[in-house]
UniProtKB/Swiss-Prot annotation:
A motif ('HIGH' region) lies at residues 9-19. Zn(2+) binds at residues 98, 100, 125, 127. It comes from the Bacteria. It holds the Pfam family Anticodon_2. Its EC number is 6.1.1.17. It is found in: Cytoplasm. This is Glutamate--tRNA ligase. Monomer. Its cofactor is Zn(2+). InterPro entries: aa-tRNA-synth_I_cd-bd, aa-tRNA-synth_I_codon-bd_sub2, aa-tRNA-synth_I_CS, aa_tRNA-synth_I_cd-bd_sf, Glu-tRNA-ligase_bac/mito, Glu/Gln-tRNA-synth, Glu/Gln-tRNA-synth_Ib_cat-dom, GluQ/Sye. Belongs to the class-I aminoacyl-tRNA synthetase family. Glutamate--tRNA ligase type 1 subfamily. It comes from Salmonella paratyphi A (strain AKU_12601). The keyword Zinc applies. Binds 1 zinc ion per subunit.
Amino acid sequence: MKIKTRFAPSPTGYLHVGGARTALYSWLFARHHGGEFVLRIEDTDLERSTPEAIEAIMDGMNWLNLEWDEGPYFQTKRFDRYNAVIDEMLEAGTAYKCYCSKERLEQLREDQMAKGEKPRYDGRCRHSHEHHADDEPCVVRFANPQDGSVIFDDQIRGPIEFSNQELDDLIIRRTDGSPTYNFCVVVDDWDMEITHVIRGEDHINNTPRQINILKALNAPVPMYAHVSMINGDDGKKLSKRHGAVSVMQYRDDGYLPEALLNYLVRLGWSSGDQEIFTREEMIKLFSLGAVSKSASAFNTDKLLWLNHHYINTLAPEYVATHLQWHIEQENIDTRNGPQLAELVKLLGERCKTLKEMSQSCRYFYEDFSEFDADAAKKHLRPVARQPLEVVRDKLSAITDWSAENVHHAIQATADELEVGMGKVGMPLRVAVTGAGQSPALDVTVHAIGKTRSIERINKALGFIAERESQQ
């Protein structure tokens, strides 16, 4: 049997982490079995679906590199197909027209709740022989079996059973002629030959209804797997304050897709004690049987740790392709300075996100207008004049500009003046970077370049002289 899965988001908002994890699990299951992965946009909610949300979903899938083999399919472009199937069901007697007014249904609901009963349609029109005009408004309901039960073997949770007496005669077409979500899903899964439906646990109650419709259509019933919820680290339902933002917000905040994928795959699935997984390892090891039935807790610190790991272990050239976007957001002109791959090597240990990296690298490429006030007050004092002058001259004398030779110049200055390296290094760091923190000084000065470093040392000396004249 050829395995075929699908990810079917509703474009009523952004692609959030819960949806991204569902997409990842569906994608991994298909790839593990050499099957196919379908992207389907369930946009039947015409009032809430937006082009912006569709674009956000596609952007998120592309950024995560969860490539699909078919689609994207749009339900709004398949209304003719859905209505044709509904008409066949009306003809076969597995569906019927319901003319009950909104007022009657509301009264029925109130009466049932007053008796402590579960609100459900009472089947009045199912058994009615009243004649109605062709243009009289009506909905179409599915004639759900009235006895027996629906049992399905959830691939994560095990067997689940629902009594048909608990299930309603579901509306499958509204009065305006539009088909409803639960029906469209069934026809889509049938037409697209989906073998495994992997989705959130909030869909468990939809599953028996959808299975009954599939059986009424004599269609094959796929396997179902319902993934548990993601909670915040406080055990409460995940919300924006926990980090439940769009996938693309994580991109904007400086995360690598590899870090987010690695984090999401472990958010409910495990393979021994392994924490770090390449994409290839995820595909090889993934199984639905290893997915937890319990809710997972979202931990931003763990995600940040993974991101820092990937910044420092992926090829710098690759990380640089993602860093480029952040550099552009900061409007940094990188034509004069180190290649971005070199920047990744320089700042990788210090920066946990690419956003942080882009916001702390400007001095490598552009001159700064002023020194950090605290750093200058502490390190650009009259006592720093001589170390800066001596190290400037030694840097000027270097013919083979390298980090090693820069280090020798700094060391030689400290030796000549008989002072510790910090007496030379800290004033030099503030002089060339404008601040009191940077990567190792030799590689920093080397990356900034000989001419620019000497110019900045002279600027710092001028700053010291000006401060002296004001005292």
